Every structure is written in C-alpha cells, then in structure tokens.
C-alpha cells in the first residue's frame, strides 16, 4: 500500500484526554477515533490489526475443535428472564423496545442466546460434545468508560460455549479452551498468565482469567518468577483428556494470583521468587455446569432415555481489548512495537527523495517485489521531510523499516532497521529482499 493513497491521520501531539499509553498511541498512530464516550471508529490501520488477531484466534479455536457461528446482537428480554438474569444484570445492559413494544436488549454476553439456540437444535446425547464460538461487537453501558479500547462501551469479543452430557466431559472441554487460549496469546506475542478467578455474574464453580503483565495494568497481580520465561506454542492432542489435564496442571502449578485471590501460604513458599506487578485481563473462561441449562429446560435424553441437564462452559477473549494490551506490553518512547504476527504491515518502505530518479526506481521495484512475494508493505512515497517519515514509521511500529536515500541508491544499498531492537544495517537491495522474504517463509 502506498502511503500517498492511504488514510493515516497521525497526530504529533498526545490528546489531553488520553490517560494510558495504548490509548495515546492508538490515537496518535491514526488507528482509532472516538465518536462518543467509550465508542470508537476503527480506521484502516487499526482494523488491519484487529483482523490479524481474529485470524490467529480463529485458527486456535478450530484446532481445539470449536465451530464458528454468528449470533444476533439483539436478544429478546424473555430469554434473559428464563435464566433469571434480566433484572439482576444491572444498568450496564442496554434495553430496547421495538415498534411493537417488544422488549429487546443489546447483548452484553450470549449465554442465554446460545443455550436456547442449541437446546432447540440438538436431539440426543450422541450430538455431544460440542463447542461453538463467534466473534461479535458487544455493548455494555459502563458508568465511566476510560482508557480507550481497554475500558470502552463497545468492544469486539470472541465468545465460545461448550455443551456436554456430564461434568467429566465438560471439564475436558474447559481444558481444551484453556490450552487454546495459551496458544492464542503466545502466537500474539503475549505472556498471558492463567489465574484462578471469581465467576461473577456468569456463575459456576471453576474459572480462570488470563492476565498480561503491563506497568499500566488495571489490577495488582502476584506471581512466581518462572512466569517471566519466554512462551512457547504447546503441541497438544485435544482429544486426550489426560494429556490436556497434565498441560493445565503444569500451567497452574507455579503461583499466580490477582489481589482478590492471594494465598499467603503459597506466597511464602515462593519466597524471593515472588513478583508483584500490574496486569490486564485479556481472557476469561468459566465452567458453570447446569446454571443455564436447568432454568432454561435444556436437557437431552441420556443412554437410558432419561433427560439429563446439559453441562456448559463459557470462554471469552476481548479482541479489541487485546490490541490495547499488546501495545501496553510492547512499545517505547517513539511508538508501538508490533509483534510480527499482528503487525498491520510487515515492512515500512521509506523513499527519502521521491524526486530522485534512482531512489524512486529502487523503491518502486522493491515495493513491487515485496508485494508479489506476499510481504505486506507500507510504502512511504509522500513528499515529506525524512524526519517526518522516520517518526511516522516508528510511531506505527512496523517490524521492519527499509530506507532508500540518494547516496545509498547510487551504490545499490539500503538501510534495514529492526523496529524491536533498533538495530540497523546497510546492505544491498537484493540482500534486504532475501532477508525479508526468508523471514516471511519461516513464519
């Protein structure tokens, strides 16, 4: 994409109402613009990152055996009355009446909707186990929306729901999602620590939240220093309950807790390896058994023909929130540092002198070759000062920068910069192309 044809309204100054670094950088980098309190329009650069995050999450959900569907944003109030949550949920739920005076709501979550949908379309215990998920915009009328996409009123969520005939099978599906979440966050370049959590209004007796460490996090967290080790992708057989349980056990054996769930005994055992930081919740999973299936009459005939209430679980990832968490965990004084897996573009190509024939020829040729090789490239071909171009590329945080100037063009060389560590090297155009495409093939 040529930057001269792109829509990238970067800001030189930090908006006064932006309090945390992710909000500041997303505004300055032209990723979002606020349209109302806690509601944002996603501009092209921000939307590309959202789509990349969605892709990774979809792949890991599919690997764990989940099927994608899409439920409506509007739900009937009667569904929520079936579960008993309509009056209990509170004013953060947006309630609506249509022209026929029928009560609707803009769903803040989908337990009731998915329970009714699957209840009406499964016939036998042989149809289980099942996991369904969808990715959908949601709305919660927060009293005080703040921190940009981290605490907005409208947000993008991945919700998954599991259905099983007994508790043993239900906990197996819970572990499937536990491991799928670990792999999703690892691929996104995040170290997400699973911590035992309260079930809150969702309900149930088993729950973990996944916390990313960040200086500007929303809550205090306490953890063993082993959690500071690099993440790795977990090769798992999702159909093997014992193997999955072993993986889960490995990931809850080292101490980690939010302020509400602290355990003084385990903290004492951790000793000088205990760490304290701030954290951001990026995912939350629940096993709530028959909390929704019983009041909503969701049973299936078991092997003996008798009706059995279905065991359920719920699994959420805040996708738009994740984007903010990635920035909180990966930035410097100059701007964002995107992990390669989610970067909106892989390469930022800078032509320092668009009026120089040599520069233009080399830059145009390299841009065309990179695009043909499948390397997403943002080509700064604007008639701007070099300093402004460097500042823009650092701000938006693309993993690699290729700089072409008049002196280098005469020699057939370019400057290649790694945004993450700042290392620069002057190499031939061909070597730069080979390095960038080789890295792409390895991914």
Swiss-Prot record:
Enzyme Commission code(s) on record: 6.1.1.15
One cellular component (GO) term of this entry: cytosol
Entry-linked SUPFAM superfamilies: Class II aaRS ABD-related (SSF52954), Class II aaRS and biotin synthetases (SSF55681)
Main subcellular location of this protein, as a coarse class: cytoplasm
Catalytic activity reported: tRNA(Pro) + L-proline + ATP = L-prolyl-tRNA(Pro) + AMP + diphosphate
Keyword annotations of the record: Aminoacyl-tRNA synthetase, ATP-binding, Cytoplasm, Ligase, Nucleotide-binding, Protein biosynthesis
GO molecular function, one term: ATP binding
One of the GO biological process terms: prolyl-tRNA aminoacylation
Presence of the UniProt keyword Ligase in the record: yes
UniProt keyword Transferase present: no
Annotated compartments: Cytoplasm
Stored InterPro entries: aa-tRNA-synt_IIb, aa-tRNA-synth_II, aa-tRNA-synth_II/BPL/LPL, Anticodon-bd, Anticodon-bd_dom_sf, Pro-tRNA-ligase_IIa, Pro-tRNA-synth_IIa_bac-type, Pro-tRNA_synthetase
Subunit record text: Homodimer.
Family: Belongs to the class-II aminoacyl-tRNA synthetase family. ProS type 2 subfamily.
Physiological role: Catalyzes the attachment of proline to tRNA(Pro) in a two-step reaction: proline is first activated by ATP to form Pro-AMP and then transferred to the acceptor end of tRNA(Pro).
Protein name stated in the entry: Proline--tRNA ligase
Gene expressing this chain: proS
